[in-house]
Amino acid sequence: MVEQNKALVRRWFDEVLTRGEVRLVDELFAPNYVLHDPGFAYEVRGRDGIKRFAATFRAASPDVRFAVEDQIAEGDVVVTRWTARGTHRGAFLEIPPTDNQRTVTGIEFDRVVDGKIDEAWVSYHLFTEGTLDPERVKRAFNMIHDAFPDLRVAQADKVAEKDKVAFRWMMSGTHEGEFMGVAPTGTRVAVMGMDIVRVGDGEILDYWGEFDVMGMLRQLGITPPLERADN
């Protein structure tokens, strides 16, 4: 069953998002589907909502191609790590078109019920930094802890398969130090993030992580919220 669920979710990336076959949404998704995308101020709901979401994404980058880098599945949940590449020709989120080639990385948790994608959570990075060595990872975590000294992370979901484990989590804290050039505001923020780790011999061998940087900046008053994606 998990392999069937993986194949179902892969069709979303390969056939709908990459090829633009939006008509397949009715076949792949449950009628009451919900997408929790932190890039939008509201949840995307229903088949019509996800059709508009896919159309918006492809309008921003008509030549977009999604590559499924990895999938992990357990029970009714499929976790997909993906990379999207395309030319930025239309506005997407708060970013106006640049006509530049853009690469976006992301992780998505999809829950499958009765052979349909019923609910999803996605986190992505619009400004991909590539591979970080251990020292840069330490600096990144130190920056976050310095900016949010009371930081708390709560696990929301966990999926494991073979030597990989995926986590979905919520992070909260008070902005008391500089963060990405933003002076302390005293604002309490809460954002979603996702990690995938590969383990061996009691150690973490590889780590892939995404969290809602845009949502955090929005809560700090840096960017305006977007309009509903399902209106």
Description of each model-found segment:
Residues 1-231:
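C-terminal and inter-domain tail/linker signature
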